[in-house]
Structure formats: C-alpha cells, structure tokens
C-alpha cells in the first residue's frame, strides 16, 4: 500500500453553468495539483460535493482522475454514509482498480454510540478491497469519534489511519501517542495541519491545496521535516484566506477562488449557493495579499 504522507488535495468537482460536471476543468485541476507537487489526490470527498453527485458521476470522476494521474501519485476515493449496509453495497459495486485507499466519513445525522461507530468501520473494513481511512469531522456529522474509539480502530485489520478534523489537538495527540506508528493520523484542518504534524501526524488532506498546491505542499513538507519556523511562515500567509473558504459553506469559498484564478467556474449545486458579492470581494483581497507575498519570497 502507498503511504499517505504529505499533502493530499480534497479535489472539488467543477460544474458548468448548467450544473453538469465539467470533466475538462476537472482534468486541468488534477494536472495543476500533481504538477505542483501534491503527494496524493482525494476524489469524491466532502469538498467534491459528494452529497449531490450521482453514482454515475462519481464513477466517471474517478475514471477521469485515474486516467489523468496515470499512476503518478496515490489516489484515495471517498465512499461514506450513515447506513452501514448501503456503504458496504456501494463499496462492493465500485471499481477499485488503480485506487490506493478508501476515505469514509463517520456516520452522520443518526448519531450512533461510540460502539456503533466502531462496528460501522469494522464492518466496512472487512468488506473493502483497499485500506480504509476513517474520517472524524464532528462539525459536519454531529458526532465525534473519540480518541478511545480511534485507538480501538487502529487494531482493526485494513484500517490504516484517521483523518482527524475535530479541531482538538489534545485528542489528536492522544491518538498519536496510543497507536502504532503505522496507524496514520492525517490532519483534516488546513490551519491546524502544522501543529498537528508537530505532534506526530503525517500530513494533511487539504481544501486550500486545490488553489495553492505548491506552497501548501512546501509548508507540509517543511513541517514533516521539523522545519517549523519555515512551515509557520507559510501558514501565516493562509490565516486570512482559510476562514473565507468556509464562511458560506465548503466548497463555495474555494470554488470562488478557483474561478478568480481562471481554473473553473464557481457553480455549486443546491442546497449550496454561490458566494455573495461581499465574500468574493474578501477572497479577492486575500488572494492579492497571498500572491504579493509569493512574489516577495
């Protein structure tokens, strides 16, 4: 199995004005990211608007990603949900040829107990043909995968790590401290990636790296190599932009920035709506500052 160290971009799904998938823009986005030095790509994650893409679109997006990638970097594919049997069925019907790992979000809305979360992931791992990365994002799911549960998951065959986006550095440290080295903790929060790596995490799955793949990758590499002064200097450039990515929902912000950069349109599917004029203005201002700082370093 490929080791998922460094930066993984949680790829957006570009849409045309009619809200159909813009596969050409998707190809360009992938090439932009890989050629800029990201370590792996994530297809059909939360940032990809997976809640509002069809089964056929998901399969086509994966096919396109694998074709463009052509084996250059590892590929992670997202399949998750709050119906364990249905998630297993979707895993069984998916084509994993060329896929290196599965990213699966914690069950949301029905708020299972910690034992239920554990049994959900155990059942998925037993049926999945590739290694599984659990995903803790309580801000979206309404439930936190506790450190104790993550530690239990580290003992399950075929679960190789957790994408930790609880925002709790103490929880991340507890997981890192009490799991084997081969159980990977990956930051799911762009602004907490550097401090989480300082505790022993191995990288980040990032939203911002869609737009600044070279600089974000440089930051993560510096942190992994314990060059924290350099990593923090780069991180400081993103502190104004990052909250704007979420101000009106993800990927609304990052798609607005990608449109500003000429990479794809900012179209999203309902119930998400495009960014307000006020937010677009703030994103433009923050982008000007970042590009100016790039030019000066």
From Swiss-Prot:
Site (Part of a proton relay during catalysis): 46, 109
UniProt xrefs under PROSITE patterns: DHDPS_2
UniProt keyword terms in alphabetical order: Amino-acid biosynthesis, Cytoplasm, Diaminopimelate biosynthesis, Lyase, Lysine biosynthesis, Schiff base
One GO CC term, this protein: cytosol
Protein origin, superkingdom: Bacteria
Subcellular localization(s) per the UniProt record: Cytoplasm
Gene3D superfamilies attached to this UniProt entry: Aldolase class I
UniProt cross-references to Pfam families, sorted A to Z: DHDPS
Coiled-coil segments: none
UniProt EC number: 4.3.3.7
One annotated GO biological process: lysine biosynthetic process via diaminopimelate
Binding, pyruvate: 47, 205
Active site, renumbered: 135 (proton donor/acceptor), 163 (schiff-base intermediate with substrate)
GO molecular function terms listed in the Swiss-Prot or TrEMBL record: 4-hydroxy-tetrahydrodipicolinate synthase activity
Catalytic activity: L-aspartate 4-semialdehyde + pyruvate = (2S,4S)-4-hydroxy-2,3,4,5-tetrahydrodipicolinate + H2O + H(+)
Pathway assignment: Amino-acid biosynthesis; L-lysine biosynthesis via DAP pathway; (S)-tetrahydrodipicolinate from L-aspartate: step 3/4
Family stated for the protein in its record: Belongs to the DapA family.
Subunit annotation: Homotetramer; dimer of dimers.
Function of the molecule: Catalyzes the condensation of (S)-aspartate-beta-semialdehyde [(S)-ASA] and pyruvate to 4-hydroxy-tetrahydrodipicolinate (HTPA).
Name of the protein this chain belongs to: 4-hydroxy-tetrahydrodipicolinate synthase
Gene name per UniProt: dapA
């Amino acid at each position: 199995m490929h080791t998922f160290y460094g930066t993984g971009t949680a790829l957006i799904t570009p849409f045309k004005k009619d809200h159909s998938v813009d596969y050409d823009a998707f190809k360009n986005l992938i090439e932009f990211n890989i050629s800029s030095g990201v370590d792996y790509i994530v297809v059909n994650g939360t940032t990809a608007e997976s809640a509002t893409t069809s089964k056929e679109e998901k399969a086509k997006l994966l096919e396109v990603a694998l074709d463009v990638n052509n084996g250059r970097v590892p590929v992670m594919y997202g399949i998750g949900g709050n119906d364990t049997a249905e998630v297993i069925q979707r895993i069984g019907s998916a084509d994993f040829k060329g896929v290196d790992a599965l990213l699966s979000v914690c069950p949301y809305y029905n708020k299972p107990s910690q034992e239920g979360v554990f049994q959900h992931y155990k059942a998925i791992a037993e049926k999945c043909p590739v290694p599984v990365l659990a995903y803790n994002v309580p801000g979206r799911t309404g439930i936190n995968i506790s450190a104790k549960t993550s530690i239990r998951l580290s003992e399950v065959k075929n679960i190789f790590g957790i994408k930790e986006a609880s925002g709790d550095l103490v929880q991340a440290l507890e997981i890192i401290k009490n799991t084997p080295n081969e159980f990977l903790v990956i930051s799911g929060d762009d602004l907490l990636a550097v401090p989480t790596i300082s505790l022993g995490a191995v990288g980040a799955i990032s939203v911002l790296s869609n737009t600044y793949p070279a600089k974000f990758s440089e930051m993560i590499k510096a942190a992994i190599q314990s060059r924290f002064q350099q990593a923090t200097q780069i991180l400081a450039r993103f502190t104004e932009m990052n909250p704007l990515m979420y101000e009106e929902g993800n990927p609304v912000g990052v798609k607005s920035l990608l449109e500003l950069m000429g990479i794809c349109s900012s179209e999203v599917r309902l119930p998400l709506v495009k960014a307000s004029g006020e937010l677009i203005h703030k994103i433009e201002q923050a982008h000007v500052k970042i590009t100016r700082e790039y030019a000066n370093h």
